[in-house]
Amino acid sequence: QMPLINNLINLLSQLFSFIFIYVLTAYCDTNKLQWVAYIYSLSPIVTLLLFYPITFLIYKELMPSLKYVKFQYIRVLMNLGIKFFLIQLSCLLIYTTSNLIISKNISPEEVTPYNIAFRYFNIVFMFFSIIIAPMWNAVSDAYNRKEFNWIQKTMKYLQNLYFFVCIGVFIMVLMSQLVYKLWIGSSVVIPFSLTIMFAVYILILTYSSLYSNFLNGMNKLNLQLYVIIVMGILFVPMATILSQCMGIIGVALSLCIANLPCAVVNYVQYRKVINIKATGLWNK
């Protein structure tokens, strides 16, 4: 019930990584890549090791113990856990295979501008995720109480927020070349068309996550699962073909195409569920 703490853990992990890598680049001249791998691997572990004892001291009832294990709930929990696992696995397939496709079909050098543009716009999604993260538990509680008016009012607020996200992304596009120059200098050239493509991608992804977050709170996972698995399977051949035709722009376009059906389905399912018109697969 405290997503802020979870986000703080992730933030500190990233902060530790940044600090250690900065020190590494400033004071170390050998085996930098190897040490970067060590830092990325150890930072989350160190952060969790720092937080977990504190958590169990404050909330002793959360400390793991065999006496709290209830085997009769294993089937229900495993069913729900497997759904989330498959959704995350499909998302991982979509987001992590892009670099491999670019490296294989185009050139390893093209991975750099692709990743820079991706990370630039991904800042928007990170901040938006932090804002909507607390809604998951709140929506779950409201849905069980059948407080649909509260859910609709909250969604209206977040839809207004999404409008400002669109404005923010538009400003980021206008300022992109200046930001790239300040960030990485002039050593890497990032096509403006790639910037536009990632702006579209992040707007689609943010829009989709807005509704998927509410659907997760309502425990409506099946339709999301089916759509994301299909798109995860189609992404690799689609990105491969488009990369051969359009270069890295084609890979970014594939991300947009893969996320668009999810955004549309999530919106339609949310409308059906909140208006109590969902039947069959739309209600699962």
How should each PLM-predicted stretch be described?
Residues 23, 49-50, 128, 156-187, ...:
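Alpha-helical transmembrane segments of multi-pass membrane transport and lipid-handling proteins
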